Amino acid sequence: MCIRDRRDTPRHLFLDEAISSRAYEDLALPIGYQQTISQPYVVAKMTEHLISDERLTAIPLKDTLEIGTGCGYQTYLLSIFSKKVTTIERIKPLQEKAKKTLEELKVKNVNFILDDGNGLDNRKYDAILSAAAPLEVPLNLKERLNIGGKLILPVGDSKQQNLIFIKRISKDKYTEEKLEDVLFVPLLKGVVS
């Protein structure tokens, strides 16, 4: 199933009513707290890279980690293609709003964690997606991948970022591919209540 063909994905439900009329334009929109919902093209590209090898199975990913829940739109898409999604958000009001929206959509396979993602446990994941940009690829994220697992994230500073796709080949070997230039919010430390 191609993400770009999911016209039934209710992006407007994840936005404030004042800008919901722009929900289906291919652009990033503000969601408050100096955060944005990514443009649909980028959301689709990131999700498709995570599920690219597994499209023939009903639910391709067993365990997915998302860093930066934001409004929950990307979380919603990940929940369609994953048995279980763990999503981390550092801004409590955003997390609460995303949780409410996903509950209204009857999404039941998402676990919400209020944290900045810096103190990850040792759990392994089939897929990891970060919606915030660190300055470089964090080693702790690569180490959280199962063998065959995939990581996609923006990397760089506020002026120049690249969308990076990483696949874990073996215990100590990874492939890394630069996909395109992007602009995401930075990955920050600390929790905002």
Q: Whereabouts are the PLM-identified features?
A:
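Short, small-residue-biased leader/transition segments that mark boundaries at the very start
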Residues: 1-3
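Amphipathic alpha-helical segments that form the core helices of the histone-fold
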Residues: 7-14
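Glycine-rich beta-alpha junction loops
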Residues: 10, 157-159, 182-183
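Short, surface-exposed glycine/acidic/tryptophan-bearing loops
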Residues: 17-31
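Conserved alpha-helix/loop element of class I SAM-dependent methyltransferases that forms part
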Residues: 23-26, 37-61
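Conserved nucleotide-cofactor-binding alpha/beta core module
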Residues: 49-174
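Substrate-binding/catalytic lobe of Class I Rossmann-like enzymes that use SAM or dcSAM, i.e.
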Residues: 163-171, 176-193
